[in-house]
Amino acid sequence: MKNQKIRIRLKAFDYKLIDQSAAEIVDTAKRTGAVVRGPVPLPTRIRRYDVLRSPHVNKTSRDQFEIHTHQRLMDIVDPTDKTVDALMRLDLPAGVDVEIALQ
């Protein structure tokens, strides 16, 4: 796997889970001899929703909700076969979305 790069993008609503998962991935990759760049914190995406409180009148009375999506980006440079096997066997929490791309 010479001259290849693995790009890992993590997304989660809880920043503690995403930092914990990123640290676990970095430790696993470094144990197998790969070079890791990151984790790089990407901008937090905030989605805001306004919902009417009343089903009939009182248009000015609303509830406001927010969802924060935290993101991290990591690059694993020159991964070995052991690195790929270790990352495949890695068990991450259910609240973390992982996107892996080979470049």
UniProtKB/Swiss-Prot annotation:
GO BP, sorted A to Z: translation
InterPro entries referenced in this protein's UniProt entry, alphabetically: Ribosomal_uS10 (IPR001848), Ribosomal_uS10_CS (IPR018268), Ribosomal_uS10_dom (IPR027486), Ribosomal_uS10_dom_sf (IPR036838)
Alphabetized UniProt keyword annotations: Ribonucleoprotein, Ribosomal protein
A Pfam family that the UniProt record links to this protein: Ribosomal_S10
Domain of life of the source: Bacteria
Record-linked SMART domains: Ribosomal_S10 (SM01403)
GO molecular function list: structural constituent of ribosome; tRNA binding
Record keyword Methyltransferase present: no
UniProt keyword Transport, yes or no: no
GO CC list: ribonucleoprotein complex; ribosome
Self-association and partners: Part of the 30S ribosomal subunit.
Function recorded in the entry: Involved in the binding of tRNA to the ribosomes.
HAMAP family to which the protein is assigned, alphabetical: Ribosomal_uS10 (MF_00508)
Family per record: Belongs to the universal ribosomal protein uS10 family.
Protein name from the UniProt record: Small ribosomal subunit protein uS10
Species of the source: Bordetella parapertussis (strain 12822 / ATCC BAA-587 / NCTC 13253)
Gene: rpsJ
